[in-house]
């Protein structure tokens, strides 16, 4: 692109945005170091105060960081600078002379008028023209060096002059080396104060008493060993002090040991009490568990005994009923058979009697021969029937006796079982008591 085209483009942009980029900026430096720019009309004849139909004022103001009017004063006021004696001459010459500071391709001229200081810049480029970057870093030896206003420099000069009058050896007190040196001086001052206090104490001591000063503030007194009254009252302390210190230290150690032992004993007593409570609780829980176990065992034993006795009783009753039924059935069967026999005998006798009238002489003969035999048979049958009845009655009596004996045996068995249960329960209770006594004894 040509330069003319670029300038035309810039002019168009200035007209659209109501800005004049060709105006010259003059900087005015006030007493405190703040820079206020003032605008003059450029080649285009436009000013920021008169441009615009709506009458808007668009003032361009540049705010710069406050710097010192004279860079040489900042260099001389730096603590690394050895001598500060020429600062008064420099400040005096600032009011009369004019200093030129070259900044690259441009120059900054600082002039002192009656009311204040004015500065003007000439050169190429916007940044070089304003001198923004160079104003912040005027010949600084290091970036650590702070930028200070003139008021601050005046106060610092007064403080430095006061320090030089009071303590000329502490002119570099603000630097790290100066701080170390100052701490050493303070330490020496403390030792001097200790020595002065010791000397005052020595003035109050009696004649012949001397003091020895060591590095520590503690002092040792040496009393005279002459034959004065003070020597009689106060013996030599240098040897006894060591003995007394050792004795006191041993005494303190013994007291600490005794206190620790007593504390341990108290702790052990507390632990013993806690363990006793735990043992009592465990014993109570054990007794309750024993009671529960004994109840469960008793219930199980009673259930087993009831289960064994009931089947035995039912079995015995069934056997007795079967035997009684068998006996009764045999008795009645025998009686029925005897009755049948007796009926047959009677029937035979009746038939023989009826046959006598119908039959002839042969029948009479046979009947005469058979009569004694039939009579003998009937008599024997009757007597056998009577004997069987007697035997049946005797069997019933024996069965009743047997039933009574079985009931007695069942009762005796139950009694023996109850006795066994009682003995077992007594043994379990005695064992529980023995365990409790063992726990309480131990």
Curated annotation (Swiss-Prot):
Annotated InterPro entries: Tda11 (IPR031388)
Region (Disordered): 16-138, 151-194, 298-328, 354-379
Skewed-composition ranges (Polar residues): 56-76, 110-121, 155-176
Biased composition (Basic and acidic residues): 16-31, 183-192
Compartment list: Cytoplasm
Ranges of compositional bias, category Low complexity: 42-55
Residues forming coiled coils: 270-300
Subcellular location, principal: cytoplasm
The organism's place on the tree of life at top rank: Eukaryota
Recorded GO CC terms: cytoplasm
UniProt keyword terms in alphabetical order: Coiled coil, Cytoplasm
Family under the similarity heading: Belongs to the TDA11 family.
Official protein name in the record: Topoisomerase I damage affected protein 11
Gene name per UniProt: TDA11
């Amino acid at each position: 692109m040509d330069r003319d085209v670029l300038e035309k483009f810039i002019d168009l942009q200035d007209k659209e945005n109501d800005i004049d980029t060709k105006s010259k900026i003059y900087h005015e430096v006030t007493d405190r170091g703040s820079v206020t720019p003032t605008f003059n009309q450029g080649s285009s004849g436009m000013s920021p105060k008169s441009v615009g139909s709506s009458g808007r004022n668009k003032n361009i103001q540049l705010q710069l960081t406050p710097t010192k009017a004279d860079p040489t004063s900042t260099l001389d006021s730096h603590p690394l600078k050895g001598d500060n004696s020429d600062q008064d001459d420099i400040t005096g010459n600032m009011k009369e002379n004019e200093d030129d500071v070259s900044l690259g391709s441009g120059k900054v001229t600082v002039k002192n008028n009656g009311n204040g200081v004015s500065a003007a810049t000439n050169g190429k480029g916007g940044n070089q023209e304003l001198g923004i970057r160079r104003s912040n870093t005027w010949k600084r030896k290091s970036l650590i060096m702070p930028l200070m206003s003139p008021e601050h420099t005046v106060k610092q000069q007064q403080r430095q002059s006061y320090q030089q009058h009071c303590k000329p050896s502490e002119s570099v007190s603000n630097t790290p080396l100066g701080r170390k040196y100052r701490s050493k001086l303070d330490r020496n001052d403390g030792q001097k104060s200790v020595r002065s206090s010791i000397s005052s104490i020595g003035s109050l001591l009696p004649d012949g008493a001397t003091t020895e000063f060591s590095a520590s503030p503690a002092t040792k007194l040496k009393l005279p060993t002459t034959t004065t009254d003070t020597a009689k009252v106060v013996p030599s302390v240098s040897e006894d002090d060591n003995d007394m210190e050792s004795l006191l230290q041993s005494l303190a150690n013994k007291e600490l040991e005794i206190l620790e032992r007593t504390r341990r004993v108290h702790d052990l007593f507390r632990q013993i009490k806690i363990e006793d409570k735990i043992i009592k609780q465990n014993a109570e829980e054990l007794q309750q568990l024993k009671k529960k176990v004994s109840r469960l065992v008793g219930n199980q034993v009673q259930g087993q005994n009831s289960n064994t006795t009931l089947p035995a009783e039912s079995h015995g009753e069934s056997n007795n009923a079967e035997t009684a039924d068998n006996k009764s059935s045999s008795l009645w069967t025998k009686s029925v058979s005897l009755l049948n026999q007796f009926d047959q005998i009677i029937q035979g006798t009746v038939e023989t009697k009826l046959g006598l009238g119908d039959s002839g002489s042969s029948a009479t003969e046979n009947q005469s021969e058979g009569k004694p035999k039939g009579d003998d048979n009937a008599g024997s049958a009757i007597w056998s029937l009577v004997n069987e009845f007697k035997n049946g009655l005797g069997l019933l009596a024996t069965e009743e006796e047997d039933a009574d004996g079985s009931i007695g045996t069942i009762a005796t068995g139950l009694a023996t079982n109850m006795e066994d249960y009682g003995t077992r329960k007594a043994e379990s209770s005695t064992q529980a008591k023995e365990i409790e006594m063992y726990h309480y004894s131990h």
